[in-house]
Amino acid sequence: NNFYKAQTQALLPYDQHLHRFAAYFQQGNMESNGKSTDRNGRPINYQTGPVVWGEAGTNGQHAFYQLIHQGTKLIPADFIAFAKRSDHEFDSIPAMKKQLDEHHEILLTNFFAQPEALLKGKDEAGVREDFAVENAKKIKEGKAPVSEEEINRLIPFKLFEGNRPTNSIFCDKLTP
């Protein structure tokens, strides 16, 4: 709270085994720091701790990442991922292993893309470039592209300024 008046902190692990990670830190941080008096029993005149929250991986992307990217509150975010996946229960089934490996690659792509986007933001040129890529794909698939009029209407809703604080914690693997 005392760091650029950020009142909240997001913990975003990209491994389902850490789906309760934010809850663990909620208890430790908010219970320990959620006080209105100092250790001598005197009232304090500063903020004592942020609201800690989060969700595993892409679950959060479809729930609250837009708030982190485009919202009016400064929300520092800690992203956590592992180079090697931790779910090996189905590795003996080649098709399942292949599917899980591909899924892990997608997770890592998202893990690296989110902090970069929060750093750089997206300006009008970037939005137009995204629509150009989307339209090229649609044309190739025989679908109608997004019209210039529609692009112009949507641009304000896709802009965000960047310069949002993040940490990326990337480890080799998650072990017990």
Describe the predicted segments one by one.
Residues 1-176:
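A SIS-like phosphosugar-recognition module
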